[in-house]
Amino acid sequence: MSKRIEAKYKINRRLGANLWGRSKSPLNRGKENPPGQHGQRRKKPSDFGTQLMAKQKLKGYYGNISEKQFRRLYDEAVRRRGDTSENLIGLLECRLDAVVYRLKFAPTPFAARQLVNHCHILVNGKRVNIPSYRVNEGDVISVKTKSKDMALILEAAQSGERDVPDYMEVDHKEMKGKFVRIPKLGDVPYAVQMEPNLVVEFYSR
């Protein structure tokens, strides 16, 4: 298991935000200080600090993806027509692991990544084991037949913690879903406020 997955709830504590809105988050148990810090006082962040925090929240939300992958997506967002921050959100939501999470085939982005890595997920009927794979509008995402009875998948599908967004369609009986359209920032059901505009400011310094 990677260090990124082992530390998923440490991300919540470090950023002071319950990124995925989960009841298991340490923030729901009063552990609000970053790991290793015991004092209650926090300095007001500088503009740089605020921008950095916005970037870390967005990276952390999508499974603490690497800086290299995140920067590559940002650079592509810049090259595309339209608003860079909206483009960035759209590209993040097109990642296969993000789509698997949104369809409620997994309880967290980390678990979604593991399902993809371990070949439990199909795209248009073909096995794909690359979490960063770019899903296109109209693509059908499904759980492999032999994996449909996995407890982790069934529990995620039945969970009432979150809903499937309207830019996707899903049939949990068949464990199959469709990526209908690329969302805008306002469409994405983040549990906390995301500020991709500050991410743009961070990289534009």
UniProtKB/Swiss-Prot annotation:
Residues 20-47 are annotated as: Disordered. It comes from the Bacteria. GO terms for cellular component: small ribosomal subunit. Gene3D superfamilies: Ribosomal Protein S4 Delta 41, Chain A, domain 1, RNA-binding S4 domain. SMART domains: Ribosomal_S4, S4. Keywords: Ribonucleoprotein, Ribosomal protein, RNA-binding, rRNA-binding. GO terms for biological process: ribosomal small subunit biogenesis; translation. One of its GO terms (molecular function) is structural constituent of ribosome. Signal peptide: none annotated. Residues 94-154 form the S4 RNA-binding domain. PROSITE patterns: RIBOSOMAL_S4 (PS00632), S4 (PS50889). Belongs to the universal ribosomal protein uS4 family. One of the primary rRNA binding proteins, it binds directly to 16S rRNA where it nucleates assembly of the body of the 30S subunit. With S5 and S12 plays an important role in translational accuracy. Part of the 30S ribosomal subunit. Contacts protein S5. The interaction surface between S4 and S5 is involved in control of translational fidelity. This is Small ribosomal subunit protein uS4. It comes from Paramagnetospirillum magneticum (strain ATCC 700264 / AMB-1). The lineage of its organism: Bacteria, Pseudomonadati, Pseudomonadota, Alphaproteobacteria, Rhodospirillales. The gene is rpsD.
